[in-house]
UniProtKB/Swiss-Prot annotation:
Zinc fingers (PHD-type) by residue: 363-416
Annotated zinc fingers (RING-type), start-end: 366-414
Gene Ontology BP terms: negative regulation of transcription by RNA polymerase II
Domain of life of the organism encoding this protein: Eukaryota
Protein name: Transcriptional repressor NF-X1 homolog
Span list, region Disordered: 1-123, 142-164, 181-282, 897-1012, 1021-1040, 1132-1167, 1447-1473
InterPro entries in the cross-refs: NFX1_fam, Znf_NFX1, Znf_PHD-finger, Znf_RING
Biological role: May play a role in transcription regulation.
CDD domains: NF-X1-zinc-finger (cd06008), RING-CH-C4HC3_NFX1-like (cd16492)
Annotated organism of origin: Dictyostelium discoideum
Origin organism lineage: Eukaryota, Amoebozoa, Evosea, Eumycetozoa, Dictyostelia
Molecular-function annotations in GO: DNA-binding transcription factor activity, RNA polymerase II-specific; RNA polymerase II transcription regulatory region sequence-specific DNA binding; zinc ion binding
Pfam families, alphabetized: zf-NF-X1 (PF01422)
């Protein structure tokens, strides 16, 4: 009320002048029409803007006035002149509400509440500035004309007065939120406007007739309006107040009116110029604007209005119209933005307004069914997110998602609601009306009443004044209390309920700092001010130190000192100021105030040091503080520092010592208890350990990382409590991060390490630079994969590759261009070698002379020195000695490395055509005999390839003869060399004489001649002895040097020189310059036999004179008697077909026929049946599955015989390769195992079902054959019975027969042999899953246990071989899930192929030699029947050829005698022929066990056991 009464008189004058301005009437109709026509060119475009501006003026009357503002009723009308008429009057009542921002609305509140100045303002067309008009500018004539015009307008368009109309919810909503779309009701004639003033204290509703502003051509863009800055109207000069004129003045003459108009035009032009100048000043001096002036709303400038104003200035008749159009422009009203696409969007529009808009447009969707929510639909709104759903949809949603606790989550905000679905009750938005019905005059789903809810999450006490609405209530529009900024210089005001976060103004804080001397120079800020940063010089209390960097106001001043010397801080040192006694100094720390008086003054000391005896009792008088204090004889008894014990010493001077009383104390970890001195305990407690003592127990509790132990002695922490943090691991983790470059720098922790935080801000490109990873690039990122071809040029220069490889990191793949290169050993040029191949080997033997000068390198063509690579050899463990490439001993190898002598680079290719030697070739030291030795070695090596024993004997004899001849030659050469040396010595005698007497004079020339004639030096004996002694020492040094050099020149291979003690060679490492050791016995294995050669034992070699021989047992004697019996009855006529017969050409022991072969010729005769030596190098029985081969041979006898015939014909032929085609894996298994049995090489071609066979150097036809072995062993599995009258016993590989001459027994023997020919039936389980094991098949055939054997051919095929047909027939009818069939022995499943075709089977030639079998004889039916065991036995029985063994044994004994004689002459032992495979059970197991043993390790010597 007080503010409303204190309205300044200027405001009242302005209100009266407003009415007078609006009553101006122009009499010049022609001028009015012309001006209006020019000004209405954009009439249609600006119609909406003018209407909105008019409505904005109307809306300004709905201002909230906190203080009662009394507005007078004004009735103003405006005239508009269309282009086609002269003068027309319109009265529009549209209430289109403009869209203004909250700041403008807030400014309107501020202007109405505090300014209370309703001034009549007029907008200038030039500058869009607000111009204030006073009554002095209006003449009396203009007032009279305006009065007439006002009366005419009142008669034509006087608005009817109607009662006050209440606001609906749309108008109320717009009133609270001007951003929303305005509600425009349809006009019905002339409708008055309701100007409602909502006052917080008193609401005064007055009816006002709001004037209409004329249509103004304002085509200014919307964006420019927003960017225009408001300008202060402070340059407007106040006009002198004129007396109030009546509302209807009297008309005056026309001449006076025109002069008044001209004066008005001049005044307006002057004011406009002042306005433009003030506008520029305001723009340039924005920083000097006062805060109070910045609160006023200033109109924006319009450039289009400026241009139009310039045209109107030239026309004086348009002044009145422009003044009338701008008369109702209220000062301080900013322009609103009416285009919804500019700033009116969902980000700035409240949720409630968005929901109202969607509901009215019927486009609001349910989040459950995605259908539009109809106006008649039953809805449910979430109380948290205010989302609307169909009631049926939300019930279905909640019923499906409800938990056991009865909670379910909202689909929009996931809030847990506890209301059960069946308790849903539809209600309006405010909750007042249950299940509201649709009313077209109200918002759908609302009750149409005022909301009245308090705003959530706000302290506002006012309730919502909007009508029932969806979404959250809008913020309260009431203003709150006035508050100050942080520094208190600026005041601000917030809306009601708005959170106050404080305000920072642009001024300085200027609060007094803590020092009390300076003020804060920072900008207005929150919190306390920072300490004063000004430093000053201060002195300590004792005066020793002066600090010039002390902060201002720090410290405490010492008031005891004088003002001229202020002191502020303590230096923490001893005071040392002189006390009042003048003798002592203060011992306290630098302190504030005066020092205490001296404590040794006689007045203050009246007792001894222990305070138990007075000085009078002691009879001592002290006169000065320097006099000593006397000591009594009592115990001190002063309480010590431990506060528990007293001093036990006598009264003494000075402080008491530490307490020496022992007390029971516990260590820091609490595990040890000891008695220690109390004083020591006190010192330990005051130290960093904070314990009485520490024990030596080491804590083994894991630290926080769970990897390291604590390791602290006497740790006070436990596994459960660690208040001191002793178990926090302080080690650095140090693990490699994922990037692979950096390590984890965190403290040791459990779990995974973090990712590497280092990034690269450079582009990571591929090597060619065409693929790039943009930064930042995490550490450890690999270069990108590039699909472009590699651009790196090779060093070799080749670029025409078969395929171009992609861009890559790292080196390029090896070059595949084919070039010609010299082999690594320098033997020949290799063609079509890859360019990237460094060492191309030609495959030949190296043949370079080694460093020992006795061997050549046996390695395949290689690069680098010819040394043995012993990197992978364990020197500590004795390695088995091999015939080639053996490892040198450790000492020799170290000597070789220390010497570092270069190896000889001579490329002496002395290798012969037999390059498959088993040891490096020996080179004799005598150069003259090298060629002879090479020839002898060639012959010897070629002769060794023959299989006849006679040839071996001859070759050995030749070798012995050659060696003897070489020795003789060496001896002769040595003798000749010795003679030559003696001759040289005799010749040297004359030279000595010449040199010794070279210095003699001419007088003694005759004596010199005489001395020259003598052959000896007779005068210089002493000098000669000295020279000889020196030469002898030099020779010894040279010999030692030579021995050391020769010791370092060892090649590391076997020596290989034949030993003198036996027929074996030296197996020591190469030892150049040293003879083979004779004190070491030969370690080679030999086999000794009994007299009849039936028994044999393997033992160590004992030299050439080995006379050890086994004794024959009873079996030998029995067989000897049988031989003699056969010889007595039948003689030797059956020895022609015996393979052991000396007269038989197939006899390997035949000494009468010898066949010598060279390296350039091949044997055309078939290879004889030989017996493999188990001690040979090529013998590898561990790779042969002999038991499985014998087992499958019982099921496939026909197939075995066909394979044997194929292999034997291949061995007897000149072919180097044989190709066989097979059908399934069983044939492949048989072919591979038989190839191992015959010791042949093979190569599989599984995709083509081919297998190729090649001959080895050790290929032989085994004896007995596999079919014979199966026939002999087959008696154990057959169901038939064999007569005991004819039995074959196999002992150590040789068969002997004990028979009777009964014909019936012979027939039984033949029948038994025929029964052995029958194959064992078998079942083939095929296509088995890899998970099927032997146990599965064993469980299937468990009822036939002991009557079958299983043999896995491969991972998916298995054979079950049965011993009788009954069990087989029962097993073949068993039902199982496995796939099986009866195995068929079909020889036609394998065929021989030559090239890509399979040969047909030719018949054997009738004229073929009986000694040589036909290559394809195994395919002849006649030959096949003859090859059977039954046929051979029957033929022998018919001819009584079974007695030929007697003659055979007899001839063998004769041959052995001859061999023994030859051995005695040549000192060479011939190995007897021993069969490889034995068919008896005991011997077979022994042979299998022996085959699995390593031949290089301990060998059992059975000689001592026998």
């Amino acid at each position: 009320m007080e503010e409303s009464q204190n309205i300044p008189p200027k405001t009242q004058t302005l209100n009266n002048s407003e009415n007078s301005i609006n009553n101006i009437n122009n009499n010049n109709l022609t001028t009015t029409t012309t001006t209006t026509a020019v000004g209405n060119t954009n009439y249609k475009n600006n119609n909406r803007y003018n209407n909105n501006r008019y409505n904005r003026n109307n809306f300004n009357n709905y201002n909230n006035n906190n203080n009662n503002n009394n507005n007078n009723n004004n009735m103003v009308t405006s005239t508009t002149s269309p282009p086609t008429t002269t003068t027309t009057t319109t009265s529009t009542t549209t209430t289109a509400t403009p869209s203004s921002n909250s700041n403008n609305r807030r400014k309107n509140y501020h202007n109405n509440n505090y300014n209370n100045n309703n001034n009549n303002n007029q907008l200038s067309e030039d500058t869009d500035e607000v111009i204030l008009y006073t009554p002095a500018d209006i003449s009396a004539s203009l007032k009279s004309e305006s009065a007439k015009q006002q009366q005419q307008q009142q008669q034509q368009s006087l608005p009817t007065q109607e009662p006050t109309q209440t606001l609906n919810w749309q108008q109320e909503l717009y009133k609270l939120n001007p951003k929303s779309k305005a509600f425009v009701p349809k006009p019905q004639g002339s409708v008055p406007f309701n100007n409602t003033n909502n006052n917080n204290n008193n609401n005064n509703n007055n009816n006002n007739n709001v004037p209409q502003s004329p249509i103004k051509d304002n085509n200014r863009p919307q964006r420019e309006r927003r960017e225009r800055k408001p300008k202060e109207n402070n340059t407007q000069q106040p006009q002198p107040q004129q007396p109030q004129q009546p509302q209807q003045p009297q008309p005056q003459p026309q001449q006076q009116q025109q002069s008044q108009q001209q004066q008005t035009v001049k005044e307006n032009n002057r004011k406009k110029e002042n306005k433009l100048q003030s506008k520029k000043d305001i723009i340039t001096n924005n920083d000097n604007i006062e805060p109070i002036k910045s609160k006023e709303d200033i109109s924006l400038a319009n450039k289009f209005a400026k241009n139009r104003a310039k045209e109107n200035l030239a026309k004086t008749n348009s002044i009145n119209n422009s003044n009338t159009a701008n008369s109702n422009k209220i000062k301080g009203k900013t322009k609103f933005i009416f285009n919804e696409n500019d700033e009116k969007n969902s980000e700035y529009t409240p949720l409630a307004i968005q929901m109202i808009t969607k509901i009215q447009a019927n486009i609001y969707e349910c989040m459950v069914c995605f259908e539009n929510v109809g106006k008649n639909a039953v809805i449910w709104s979430c109380s948290q997110c205010f989302t609307m759903f169909h009631s049926s949809c939300i019930k279905q949603w909640s019923s499906k998602s409800v938990t056991t606790e009865g909670k379910w989550k909202c689909p929009g905000c996931r809030y847990n609601h506890e209301v059960k679905p069946e308790h849903f009750q539809p209600a309006c938005f405010c909750g007042k009306v249950k299940d509201p019905q649709y009313n077209p005059y109200h918002l759908a789903h609302s009750c149409g009443e005022v909301c009245g809810k308090l705003r959530a999450k706000s302290n506002c006490p006012h309730s919502c004044t909007m009508l029932c609405h969806p979404g959250p209530c809008l913020n309260c529009s009431s203003l709150g209390d006035i508050k100050d900024c942080y520094c208190g210089k600026t005041k601000y005001r917030l809306l009601c309920g708005e959170v106050d976060k404080g305000k920072v103004c642009e001024g300085k804080c200027e609060k007094l700092l803590s020092c009390g001397n300076h003020r804060c120079q920072q900008q207005c800020h929150s919190g306390s001010c920072s300490p004063c940063e000004v430093v000053e010089t201060q002195k300590c209390y004792c005066g020793k130190h002066i600090d010039k960097t002390k902060p201002c106001g720090s410290g405490s001043i010492d008031t005891s000192q004088s003002d001229d010397d202020p002191r502020f801080f303590s230096c923490a040192e001893k005071c040392d100021r002189t006390l009042d006694c003048g003798n002592h100094k203060c011992q306290r720390t630098c302190h504030k105030g005066d020092c205490e008086p001296c404590s040794l003054v006689p007045d203050r000391v009246d007792r001894c040091n222990c305070k138990q005896t007075t000085l009078e009792e002691l009879g001592v008088v002290r006169t000065s503080c320097l006099d000593p204090i006397p000591v009594c004889k009592k115990v001190c008894s002063t309480l010590l520092a431990c506060k528990q014990h007293s001093c036990t010493d006598r009264c003494h001077t000075g402080p008491c010592g530490s307490c020496k009383v022992k007390v029971r104390s516990i260590c820091r970890c609490g595990k040890t208890t000891e008695n220690r001195q109390c004083g020591v305990i006190q010192q330990n407690m005051s130290s960093t350990s904070a314990a009485a003592f520490t024990c030596g127990n080491v804590c083994k509790i894991l630290r926080s990382c769970k990897r390291h132990e604590c390791g602290v002695k006497c740790c006070p922490s436990t596994s459960s409590s660690d208040e001191a943090g002793n178990h926090v691991c302080t080690l650095v983790c140090g693990k490699q991060l994922k990037c692979g470059v950096h390590k984890c720098q965190q403290l040791c922790h459990s779990g995974k390490c973090y990712n590497c935080y280092i990034n690269s801000y450079d582009d990571l490109a591929c090597p060619c630079g065409k693929t790039v990873i943009q930064p930042p690039v995490p550490c450890g990122t690999k270069p990108p994969m590039c699909n472009h071809p590699c651009t790196i040029k090779r060093e070799c220069g080749h670029s025409n590759e078969v395929w171009e490889h992609k861009c890559h990191s790292g080196p390029c793949p090896p070059c595949t261009y084919l070039v010609d290169k010299m082999c690594a050993g320098g033997h020949q040029v290799q063609k079509s070698v890859k360019c990237s191949t460094i060492d191309a080997s030609c495959g030949r033997i190296c043949g370079k002379v080694l460093s020992c000068l006795s061997h050549t390198c046996p390695r395949i063509c290689h690069s680098g020195p010819c040394l043995i690579n012993n990197n992978n050899v364990n020197i500590n463990k004795q390695q088995p000695l091999l015939p080639a490439n053996l490892i040198a001993s450790k000492n020799n190898y170290q000597l070789q490395q220390q010497s570092k002598l270069p190896t000889t680079t001579t490329t002496t290719t002395t290798t012969t055509s037999t390059t498959s030697t088993t040891s490096p070739k020996i080179i004799e030291k005598d150069e003259e005999l090298i060629e002879d030795d090479n020839n002898n070695n060639n012959n010897n090596n070629n002769n060794n390839n023959n299989n006849n024993n006679n040839n071996n004997n001859n070759n050995n004899n030749n070798n012995n003869n050659n060696n003897n001849n070489n020795n003789n030659n060496n001896n002769n050469n040595n003798n000749n060399n010795n003679n030559n040396e003696k001759a040289e010595i005799t010749n040297e005698c004359n030279h000595d004489h010449d040199h010794e007497h070279e210095h003699s004079d001419d007088e003694n020339s005759e004596e010199e001649v005489d001395l020259n004639e003598c052959n000896h030096n007779h005068e210089c004996n002493e000098e000669e002895e000295r020279i000889k002694k020196e030469e002898k020492e030099d020779d010894e040094d040279e010999d030692e040097l030579f021995d050391s050099l020769m010791g370092n020149l060892t090649c590391g291979y076997l020596c290989g020189i034949p030993l003198k003690s036996c027929e074996h060679t030296c197996h020591q490492a190469c030892h150049p310059g040293e003879p083979c050791p004779t004190n070491i016995s030969c370690k080679q294995k030999v086999r000794i036999y009994c007299k009849c050669k039936r028994r044999s034992v393997e033992t160590l070699c004992c030299g050439k004179d080995d006379t050890r021989q086994l004794e024959c047992d009873e079996v030998c004697e029995k067989e000897e008697r049988e031989k003699q019996l056969k010889e007595a009855f039948y003689g030797s006529h059956t020895l022609d077909n015996n393979p052991n017969n000396p007269n038989n050409p197939n006899n390997p022991n035949n000494n009468t026929t010898t066949t010598t072969t060279t390296t350039t010729t091949t044997t055309s005769s078939p290879t004889n049946f030989t017996v493999l030596d188990p001690t040979s190098i090529d013998y590898q029985p561990n790779k042969l599955q002999i038991e499985a081969l014998q087992l499958i041979a019982k099921a496939s006898p026909k197939l075995i015989k066909k394979i044997e015939a194929i292999y034997e014909d291949f061995i007897n032929s000149n072919l180097l390769k044989q190709t066989i085609k097979y059908t399934d894996s069983i044939q492949l298994f048989l072919l591979v195992q038989m190839a191992k049995f015959y010791q042949m090489k093979y190569r599989e071609k599984k995709p083509l079902n081919y297998i190729e066979f090649f001959k080895k150097t050790s290929y032989q036809i085994p004896s007995p054959r596999l079919s014979e072995m199966v026939g002999i062993n087959g008696s154990s599995l057959s169901s038939g019975t064999i007569s005991n009258s004819l039995s074959f016993s196999i002992n150590n590989g040789q068969s002997y027969a004990s028979i009777s001459l009964s014909p019936s027994e012979m027939v039984a023997q033949a029948q038994a042999q025929a029964e052995l020919e029958n194959q064992c039936p078998a079942l083939l389980f095929k296509n088995l899953d890899p998970s099927i094991k032997t146990d599965h098949l064993t469980n299937l055939l468990q009822e036939f246990e002991g009557r079958y054997k299983l043999m896995w051919v491969d991972d998916s095929n298995c054979l079950a071989i049965f011993g009788d047909s009954i069990s087989f027939s029962m097993a073949s009818q068993i039902k199982t899930m496995f796939t099986y069939e009866i195995y068929q022995d079909d020889p036609s499943l394998i065929d021989i192929t030559f090239g890509n075709s399979v040969l047909s089977t030719p018949t054997s030639s009738s004229g073929s030699n009986s000694g040589v079998s036909s290559p394809l004889s195994y395919l002849s039916p006649l030959k096949k029947s003859q090859d059977t065991q039954f046929f051979r036995v029957s033929q022998q029985m018919n001819k009584f050829s079974f007695l030929d063994t007697i003659n055979q044994n007899q001839n063998q004994n004769n041959n052995n005698n001859n061999n023994n004689n030859n051995n005695n002459n040549s000192n060479i032992n011939i190995k007897p022929t021993i069969p490889l495979y034995s068919t008896s059970t005991a011997n077979a197991n022994r042979m299998l066990r022996r085959s699995n043993e390593n031949t290089g390790e301990n060998v059992a010597d059975d000689w001592e056991n026998l």
